[in-house]
Regions:
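Active-site flanking residues adjacent to catalytic metal/cofactor-binding acidic residues
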Residues: 164, 256-259, 285, 344
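Thiamine diphosphate
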Residues: 1-241, 246-251, 320, 355-374
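A short, acidic, amphipathic alpha-helical segment used as a generic capping/interface helix at domain edges
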Residues: 147, 322-335
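A short alpha/beta connector and helix-capping loop motif
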Residues: 86, 96, 265-286
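A contiguous pocket-lining binding segment that forms or flanks enzyme active sites
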Residues: 279-313, 319
Length: 374
C-alpha cells in the first residue's frame, strides 16, 4: 500500500542493504534528494559523471570489480546510454541498476522538450532489453522489488531499471553546513554576466543559449530575434552554434554555455578548435553546479577549460571573474574573429521567481532562421 513519497535516506539505505553501490550519474531534480543524501552521508560512494553514457560505463567497470552499482539519470539523457547499454552491458553481460526519472510522463504537465522522451521511455528501455517498472513508493514493496531486480540481473546478466515519477522521493533535509570563507570579491550572478555579454557584443551577433536557466534568463532580460534558446539537448548548444557559424561566414556567432553542459559534450571543443578560423565566441558560464536541476555540484572546479580550449586550437582563451574583464574579453574576441573561449566564473543561484520560456521552441527556431536570412 502506498505511503506517499519515499524518504531519500530510506531509498538509499534500502539500496545499500541490498548490496547496491557505488552510485554514479547525472542529476535530475526528481532524484535531487537522493544525490543530496549520498553527498552528505556517503560521499565516497557517489561519483559525479559528465554524461549518462559515461555513468553507465563507470558502473560497468564497478560490476567487473565485483560491485552492484546504481546509475542515476534523467530520462532526457536516456539516449546517451544507448551505446553502452546495448554494446557494453548487454554484450559483456554486465548488469547495472538504473534509476531513471520520468519527465514528460503522459498525461502530466511538463516542458515541451520532455514530451517525446516521456512517451517512449518505457518502450525504449524494453527495446534495449532492460526490464523496467515504476519505483514503488512503499518501502516494504520496494524491498520486494529490489529482490526481484537482483534475481533478474543475477540470472540474465542484464540491467534493470526503476522509473522514478515526479514527487516519488521526498526532499532531503541535510544538516546546515558552515559557509565557506569568501575568496576574493563576490562573483557575478549569471543574469548579470549575461547582461554584460549582450551589451558588449555586436548587436547583430547570432547568440545560441544552452538549455535551462541560462536560456530562460536571456529570454527574460534580453530577448531578440537573433537569440536561439536551446531547450533540452544538454551539451549541444556549442555544436549548434558552430554549425550556424560554419554556414553563415559573414555573421558573428556566440554561444552561452554552462560548465555542466560543456563537460557533457567536451568533444565539441576539439571540433571548434579544428575550425578555429570560424567566427565563434564560446562563453562558458561556470558556477560549478547543475543549477537547473537543483544546484548539485559539477566536476568543473578542477577543470582547466581555458587550457583545454588552447590545446584544441582556439585562437585565444580568457578566464574572467569580473564585469570589466568579461566585457573586454568579448570585445577582443569579436574584433579578432575566429574561435575564442571566455570562461566566466559566476556565483551559484538564480531568481526563484524565474519563469518558463514565453516563446515556444519551434517559434524560437523559426524566428532565429528568419534573423539569419535577413
Amino acid at each position: 500500500m502506498s505511503t506517499g513519497a519515499l524518504q531519500a535516506r530510506t531509498l538509499v539505505e534500502l539500496l545499500r542493504e541490498h548490496g547496491h553501490g557505488p552510485f554514479t550519474g547525472v542529476p535530475c531534480s526528481f532524484l535531487g534528494p537522493v544525490i543530496s543524501c549520498l553527498e552528505a552521508e556517503h560521499p565516497q560512494e557517489y561519483v559525479i559523471a559528465a554524461n549518462e553514457g559515461e555513468a553507465v560505463a563507470l558502473a560497468a567497470g564497478a560490476v567487473l570489480a565485483g560491485r552492484r552499482p546504481v546509475v542515476i539519470l534523467q530520462n532526457s539523457g536516456l539516449g546517451n546510454t544507448v551505446n553502452p547499454l546495448t554494446s557494453l552491458c548487454h554484450t559483456l553481460r554486465l548488469p547495472v541498476l538504473l534509476l531513471v526519472t520520468w519527465r514528460g510522463r503522459p498525461g502530466r504537465p511538463d516542458e515541451p522538450q520532455h514530451e517525446l522522451m516521456g512517451r517512449i521511455t518505457q518502450d525504449m528501455l524494453t527495446s534495449m532489453g532492460v526490464r523496467n517498472e515504476v519505483l514503488p513508493d512503499d518501502p516494504a514493496l520496494l524491498a520486494e522489488r529490489l529482490d526481484v531486480a537482483a534475481g533478474h540481473m543475477d540470472t540474465t546478466g542484464l540491467p534493470f531499471a526503476f522509473i522514478v515519477p515526479k514527487g516519488a522521493v521526498a526532499p532531503y533535509e541535510a544538516a546546515a553546513a558552515a559557509p565557506a570563507p569568501a575568496a576574493g570579491p563576490p562573483l557575478m550572478k549569471r543574469a548579470e554576466a549575461i547582461g554584460h555579454i549582450v551589451s558588449a557584443m555586436d548587436p547583430d551577433t547570432l547568440l545560441v543559449a544552452t538549455t535551462g536557466k541560462t536560456a530562460r534568463e536571456l529570454e527574460r532580460d534580453w530577448d531578440r530575434p537573433q537569440n536561439l534558446y536551446v531547450v533540452g539537448s544538454m551539451g549541444c548548444a556549442s555544436s549548434v552554434a558552430l554549425g550556424v557559424a560554419l554556414n553563415t561566414p559573414d555573421r558573428r556567432v556566440a554561444v552561452l554555455d554552462g560548465d555542466g553542459a560543456a563537460l557533457m559534450r567536451l568533444e565539441a571543443m576539439a571540433t571548434i578548435g579544428r575550425h578555429s578560423g570560424t567566427d565563434l565566441c564560446h562563453l562558458l558560464l561556470d558556477n560549478e553546479s547543475y543549477e537547473s536541476t537543483g544546484g548539485q555540484p559539477t566536476a568543473s572546479a578542477g577543470v582547466d577549460f581555458a587550457g583545454i580550449a588552447a590545446a584544441c586550437g582556439y585562437r585565444s582563451t580568457h578566464d574572467v571573474r569580473d564585469a570589466d574583464a568579461l566585457r573586454a574579453a568579448v570585445l577582443r574576441a569579436q574584433q579578432d574573429g575566429g574561435a575564442h573561449l571566455v570562461r566566466v566564473r559566476i556565483a551559484p543561484g538564480s531568481d526563484p521567481n524565474l519563469g518558463r520560456p514565453a516563446l515556444a521552441p519551434p517559434a524560437s527556431a523559426a524566428r532565429f532562421k528568419e534573423a539569419i536570412a535577413r
